[in-house]
Amino acid sequence: MNHIDMHRATFNILTVLRLCFLSTCLLLSVPLRAQQTHSTPPQAFQQLPPSQQSASIGTGFFVANGYMLTALHVVINSELILIGPTEDKKWIKAEIIKTDIASDLALLSVNMTAPPLALANWRDVPIGLEVFAIGYPQPRIQNPSKKITQGIINGNRTDRNESINAEYFQYSAETSVGNSGGPLIAPDGQVIGMVQSKLNALGAAQKTNDLAINVSYALKSSKLIDFLDKTPAATTASNLSLSSQLRPYQILSKTQGSIFAVLSRKNAPLSGTP
């Protein structure tokens, strides 16, 4: 690549970043639009939505060397996907190689060496287990800075008809726009789910006069493993260690090189998405 081409490439990346960080509507967390299937949150839940602007940010994590998981709505209809920032402040181009609309999942191929995170066997996960959400919340306000929050698994998600949705669980770690697609980490450092949705707190408050705080939902690790089957990133479930109790700063350090922001320049907004 000659000097002119390098200059153009740098300019293009900077242009995307400016679109992302200067946009007044850069909100990437939960679409209110979702198909009414057993795999998709009902209208009472917000599914962390892509912005109508030309660029947006979510979170992703490596599950194999060169392969990253994120939420599909983070990257759908994108003409350019970048992963970063790396230690040397670079952004690496990524490509979608598999998607699942119903489960809101996307597998990305990235020319990047990064340690993968292990996916825990969901059958080992007890209700009440401590959990850590790691991602890039509120990028328009806080800049693209990685954050960690702590909570517990509150239980399985119950849909409006009071049936148990076996694919999602409720957790209390604070989750904001930009966390979408990020991992939920157990105290032993393994992934037990992916951040995908949260309760529409303002909508619920208008109906109940009660403001629910930190009611969020994640797709279980068992669904992530099923999605990766028959792909280059296929993996098996690891046994969860309930005796291992890493502290938050240790969790963040352990996963530091595996979790990145996913920057997506949109080709066109999703129809019906706010």
Language-model-derived ranges and their functions:
Residues 47-71, 90-93, 115-118, 181, ...:
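A conserved glycine-rich beta-strand in the N-terminal activation segment of trypsin-fold
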Residues 35-48, 116, 137-141, 191, ...:
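C-terminal cap/linker of serine protease catalytic domains
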Residues 1-15:
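N-terminal secretory signal peptides that target proteins for export/translocation
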Residues 16-29:
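Bacterial N-terminal signal peptides
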Residues 117-167, 175-179, 195-206:
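Flexible, gly/ser-rich surface segments that form the specificity/activation loops bordering the active-site cleft
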Residues 65, 97-99, 156, 187, ...:
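Residue-level recognition of beta-strand microenvironments
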